[in-house]
Amino acid sequence: GICRDTTVESMVIVFADIPELTCVWRAFPRPCIAPYLPWYVGIAKLPKGYENFGAKTALASHFAVDPTEFRYDSSRAYWAFHMLENIMEFDYQFCEEKVHGDIEKMEAAMTAAKPLIDEAYRKLAETSPEYARQLLTDYTAAQAQKAWEWAEQTALELVDMKNAANMDFWRSKL
């Protein structure tokens, strides 16, 4: 399956006639834990918190990772998804309904918005290619930020829900 403990990332690429509108629908770390987010090929830069290093530094340190990279850092999106992933793996069945319901809603909204963003890009590109590219950059960043905030909030909610369920269980034994 596409959602196993060995899955690091999943993506679906939707090619477009206009290369900048080619969209990589990316689920990190796994599609059962995170929504597929639209990452347009035409973006000018990666969303804040999603790039740890520049390309040269990343290549140089790929097989010799600095130990500080393994410490939690709230300024990096990776850690929000990693925290959610760990909570989900601890009790997948307990978390599944909430997480999958949220993912379905987010993906439906992004899927519905895509044709509108594409059309806005096309119209804007006729008069200002730079602004059109910025539109894609801003939209991609906004969706990435929403998902990051959702992952953080959902991880906390799941912990609270699990604690409440445990307390209810033990109270029922009194």
Predicted features by range, described:
Residues 1-174:
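C-terminus-biased signal that marks the final domain/tail of proteins
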